């Protein structure tokens, strides 16, 4: 019985400075995952076009994100690292999925509603069809797992829906070509060409919030630079931002339950726990009953110790664009070989002549 080979896929848009939330919520975890899993990590520069970036800035951001990957510990000898636009099979499979997915499915995507806002009629078709390309990114490599944040869970569910509909729509053709793979859907054993990709469950650091508003996710689009710690920030800037982080007037609680309803306190304790690879309970054992100034001082030292080596290596790599380009080129060749193998089967399945 054939089964899908375990494979992890994930990607990041090159749209500005990566920050602490990206590192703790994604990249740090990816570094750990590559030790035990086969991984593909992608800089999704095709997705970036949905926000109409300056072309020169997009190329620079693509290199900076790649530099952050490498500086944080992602090893191109262990994992495939590439930028999406080098492998045009992403767009080819996305078109197939555009013909499989239903408009109603896309219309329910909350991220489109959030990004398009009230001016939906002027939003680009690319933004509307973003989840279809995301599904293609994942399924082009027949990835079995994806580390996802809260804001991407709905898109992964759509990816599974698209995979299942493709498998159902073309079930006879898949069987006749002998390219089906056995998998379990609920209690039923079925055969399909694409896997129903599973989310990788993250630890508590998955959602890092703004330093200025604990109810909002840390974001590179926030107009206040004090709201986030960028991976390119120097030691003094990191310390300043943590010192100025918003808190409430009460001291730190001794129990995790005491963080309820206190988003800024919860965020700082969570960041400390994530950077120190411990738990909120352990942090509060040390700082419970003390003032925020004590936690902030220790957190600043910890953040500098953890992030400064990444910052220095990232700057060194950005100064050597030829090396970054070679990493992306080599990764693109590896990814392209896998992608073409998948698409040869997809073309046969849907009936595109290839002779």
UniProtKB/Swiss-Prot annotation:
It comes from the Bacteria. Coiled coil: none annotated. One of its GO terms (biological process) is tryptophanyl-tRNA aminoacylation. A motif ('KMSKS' region) lies at residues 217-221. A motif ('HIGH' region) lies at residues 14-22. It catalyses: tRNA(Trp) + L-tryptophan + ATP = L-tryptophyl-tRNA(Trp) + AMP + diphosphate + H(+). Pfam families: tRNA-synt_1b. Its EC number is 6.1.1.2. ATP binds at residues 13-15, 21-22, 149-151, 208, 217-221. Belongs to the class-I aminoacyl-tRNA synthetase family. Catalyzes the attachment of tryptophan to tRNA(Trp). This is Tryptophan--tRNA ligase. It comes from Brucella melitensis biotype 1 (strain ATCC 23456 / CCUG 17765 / NCTC 10094 / 16M).
């Amino acid at each position: 019985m054939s089964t899908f080979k375990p494979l992890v896929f994930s990607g990041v848009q090159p749209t500005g400075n990566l920050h602490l939330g990206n590192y703790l919520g994604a990249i740090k975890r990816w570094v750990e995952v590559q030790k035990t899993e086969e991984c593909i990590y992608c800089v999704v520069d095709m997705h970036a076009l949905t926000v109409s970036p300056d072309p020169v800035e997009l190329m620079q951001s693509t290199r900076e994100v790649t530099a952050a990957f490498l500086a944080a510990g992602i090893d191109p000898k262990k994992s495939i690292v590439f930028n999406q636009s080098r492998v045009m099979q992403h767009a080819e499979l996305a078109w197939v999925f555009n013909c499989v997915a239903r408009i109603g499915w896309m219309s329910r995507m909350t991220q489109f509603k959030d990004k398009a806002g009230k001016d939906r009629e002027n939003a680009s078709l690319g933004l509307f069809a973003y989840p279809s390309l995301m599904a293609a990114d994942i399924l082009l490599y027949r990835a079995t797992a994806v580390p996802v944040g809260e804001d991407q869970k709905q898109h992964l569910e759509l990816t599974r829906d698209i995979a299942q509909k493709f498998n159902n729509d073309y079930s006879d053709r898949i069987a006749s070509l002998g390219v089906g793979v056995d998998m379990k859907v609920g209690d039923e054993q079925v055969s399909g060409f694409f896997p129903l990709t599973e989310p990788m469950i993250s630890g508590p650091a998955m959602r890092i919030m703004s330093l200025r508003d604990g109810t909002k996710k840390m974001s590179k689009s926030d107009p206040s630079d004090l709201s986030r710690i960028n991976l390119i920030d120097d030691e003094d800037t990191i310390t300043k931002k943590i010192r100025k982080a918003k808190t409430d007037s009460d001291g730190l609680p001794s129990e995790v339950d005491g963080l309820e309803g206190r988003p800024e306190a919860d965020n700082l304790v969570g960041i400390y726990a994530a950077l120190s690879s411990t738990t909120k309970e352990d942090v509060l054992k040390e700082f419970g009953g003390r003032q925020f100034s004590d936690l902030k001082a220790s957190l600043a030292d910890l953040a500098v110790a953890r992030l400064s080596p990444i910052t220095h290596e990232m700057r060194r790599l950005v100064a050597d664009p030829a090396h970054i380009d070679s990493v992306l080129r080599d990764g693109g060749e590896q990814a392209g070989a896998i992608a073409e193998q998948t698409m040869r089967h997809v073309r046969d399945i849907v009936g595109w002549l290839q002779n």
